[in-house]
């Protein structure tokens, strides 16, 4: 047993670290391709959203705690889950409410006159929505999606009586139907997002107030998938000093403090840590420190030489702990604290982390090494900024990836300003430059041919020392060649050129071609305003419509009459008195 332990430990002390080549570990047993074009154009890491970030101080405590070999730990077998953010779609109704007053009056001729006064739109009280929601939702299935609007009044006209006039006050509700994406929060609670203001509405509430009210049927929700998906069953170590779980197998570290406990989720009973990790604990075993385990071997050994060697190994491991692991935590904290517009993922003893800034505070976002990220084919690119679409074979999630970065994140989005960017570049006759972390792909003006690749000798993706047991070697699922990427870039540029026009022509035609997308957007905006005005007009009573028409034509008449009158007055010749000779009646 002692000999076996020595055989296992000596390579750690005296073995060589695998060399790092262009951001990935080289397999020494394989021939590595060394052509001029990089083949490892995949992102290396998958990082969370900014709301998963933690302060650097929290990360530092976990990092230093993971370095200790002299403290007792607890090993756990647990199943880690990631959140299945989108779980389906749900039909909702938007309710735009306005106060309304309905009147009845008997004329001198005995006729019953009815009129309505509708005020400007404002949200109705919650109890009004609770009262009318069942009646409105009963008709949901018969209404089409889209811009159709249905009018629902909470009151009827009062009866006409000769004795006096009568009035009633209530609400006019304009209803439209649409479908919104159904999402899940970290605890498995379904919710939707207000498309106008971004408010979160829990499904269990049945309604939500944004710019106007939203309502939906709770009993019609179909179970379209589980809120959680498993990331695998892994072995994690409980670091008692920082009360943190460290899971080297999936490069994840998280708080052991339970923020929420779910007893009946779609995956059974699970815990949610205070930093948002969902997990299920299978078993727990208390394990002594590494140094205590080595000392226990000393008592089992009969040979003095082996006993002495175990003591030396114990001391050597202690020195490695202080000189490598803890110093790495210190240096990494310094690197993370330096602000950068293009931060890189940094591997640490507690997994890979991405430095970021949140609310003026330096934070770190948890990441995981992910060799299952592949570039989608056919190649799909975005030119503003330059992004490539990739997909995770493990989760099915799709991301926009900036090739100058080593990671992907759900926060990265395509802005969609390709036409404007391409036109501005063409006016200056500048080449299009698409940057990768090892170089750049250049397409020269007028962008009607293939590009050229220029290498960037200084470009690299940071990868720290690989001696930590938590850092596993990355192997790529399928190598990607640069020509495959650049063909997709060429195709995208040519598509944008076709929509912009002949930008190589110096005449004004290119200008009008570039303006065409803006003209289309303006036309859509005008059409939207016109449809809104039409809907508003249909909600008015006849008396109000007559008043609006009279005011409109009065204003138009004044606009035409005033300039005309001024022009007529200016056209008349000015009055001048007739000059007559002066006749004196007296002596001269």
UniProtKB/Swiss-Prot annotation:
PTM: Glycosylated by host. Glycosylation is crucial for glycoprotein export at the cell surface.
Keyword Repressor tagged: no
GO cellular component: membrane; viral envelope; virion membrane
Example of a GO biological process term: virion attachment to host cell
Subcellular location: Virion membrane
Membrane topology: Single-pass type I membrane protein
TM stretches of this protein: 548-568
Keywords: Glycoprotein, Host-virus interaction, Membrane, Signal, Transmembrane, Transmembrane helix, Viral attachment to host cell, Viral envelope protein, Virion, Virus entry into host cell
Virion surface face residues: 23-547
Keyword Signal: yes
Positions in the Intravirion compartment: 569-588
Coiled coil region boundaries: none
Record's signal peptide: 1-22
Family designation: Belongs to the nucleorhabdovirus glycoprotein family.
Quaternary state and interactors: Homotrimer. Interacts with matrix protein.
Record function comment: Attaches the virus to host cellular receptor, inducing endocytosis of the virion. In the endosome, the acidic pH induces conformational changes in the glycoprotein trimer, which trigger fusion between virus and cell membrane.
Official protein name in the record: Glycoprotein
């Amino acid at each position: 047993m002692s000999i076996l332990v020595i055989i296992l430990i000596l390579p750690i002390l005296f073995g060589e670290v695998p060399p790092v080549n262009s951001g990935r570990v080289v397999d020494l047993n394989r021939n590595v391709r060394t052509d001029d074009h990089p083949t490892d154009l995949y992102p290396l890491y998958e990082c969370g959203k900014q709301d998963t970030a933690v302060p650097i101080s929290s990360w530092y405590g976990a990092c230093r705690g993971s370095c200790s070999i002299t403290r007792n730990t607890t090993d756990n077998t647990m199943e880690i889950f990631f959140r299945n953010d989108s779980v389906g779609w749900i039909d909702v109704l938007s309710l735009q409410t306005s106060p309304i007053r309905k009147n009845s009056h008997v004329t001198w001729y005995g006729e019953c006159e009815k009129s309505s006064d509708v005020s400007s739109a404002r949200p109705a009280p919650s109890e009004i929505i609770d009262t009318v929601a069942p009646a409105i939702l009963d008709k949901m299935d018969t209404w089409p999606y889209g811009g159709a609007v249905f009018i629902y009044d909470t009151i009827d006209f009062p009866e006409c009586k000769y004795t006096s006039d009568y009035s009633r006050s209530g609400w006019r509700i304009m209803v439209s139907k649409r479908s919104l994406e159904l999402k899940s929060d970290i605890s498995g609670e379904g919710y939707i997002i207000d498309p106008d203001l971004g408010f979160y509405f829990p499904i269990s509430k049945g309604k939500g107030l944004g710019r106007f009210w939203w309502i939906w049927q709770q009993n019609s929700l179909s179970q379209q998938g589980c809120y959680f998906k498993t990331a695998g069953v892994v072995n994690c170590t409980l670091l008692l000093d920082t009360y943190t779980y460290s899971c080297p197998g999936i490069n994840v570290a998280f708080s052991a403090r339970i923020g929420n406990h779910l007893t009946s989720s779609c995956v059974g009973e699970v815990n949610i840590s205070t930093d948002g990790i969902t997990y299920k604990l299978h078993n727990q075993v208390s394990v002594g420190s590494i140094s205590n385990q080595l000392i226990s071997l000393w008592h089992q050994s009969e040979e003095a030489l082996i006993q002495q060697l175990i003591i030396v190994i114990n001391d050597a491991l202690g020195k490695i702990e202080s000189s490598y692991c803890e110093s790495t935590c210190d240096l990494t904290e310094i690197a993370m604290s330096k602000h950068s517009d293009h931060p890189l993922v940094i591997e640490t003893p507690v997994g890979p982390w991405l430095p970021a800034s949140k609310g003026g505070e330096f934070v770190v976002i948890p990441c995981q090494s992910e060799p299952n990220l592949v570039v989608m084919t056919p190649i799909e690119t975005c030119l503003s900024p330059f992004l490539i679409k990739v997909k995770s074979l493990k989760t099915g999630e799709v991301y926009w990836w900036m090739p100058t970065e080593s990671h992907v994140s759900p926060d990265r989005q395509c802005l969609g300003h390709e036409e404007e960017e391409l036109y501005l570049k063409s006016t200056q006759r500048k080449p299009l430059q698409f940057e990768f972390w090892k170089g750049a792909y250049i397409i020269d003006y007028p962008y009607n041919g293939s590009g050229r690749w220029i290498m960037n000798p200084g470009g690299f993706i940071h990868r720290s020392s690989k001696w930590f047991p938590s850092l596993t070697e990355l192997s790529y699922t399928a190598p990607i060649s640069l020509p495959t990427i650049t063909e997709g870039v060429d195709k995208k540029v040519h598509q944008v050129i076709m929509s912009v026009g002949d930008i190589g022509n110096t005449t004004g035609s290119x200008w009008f071609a570039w303006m065409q997308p803006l003209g289309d957007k303006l036309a859509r905006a005008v059409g939207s305003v016109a449809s809104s005005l039409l809907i508003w007009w249909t909600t008015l009573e006849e008396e109000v419509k007559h008043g609006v028409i009279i005011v409109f034509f009065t204003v138009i008449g004044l606009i035409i009459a005033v300039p005309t009158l001024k022009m007529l007055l200016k056209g008349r010749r000015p009055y001048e008195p007739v000059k007559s000779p002066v006749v004196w009646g007296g002596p001269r």
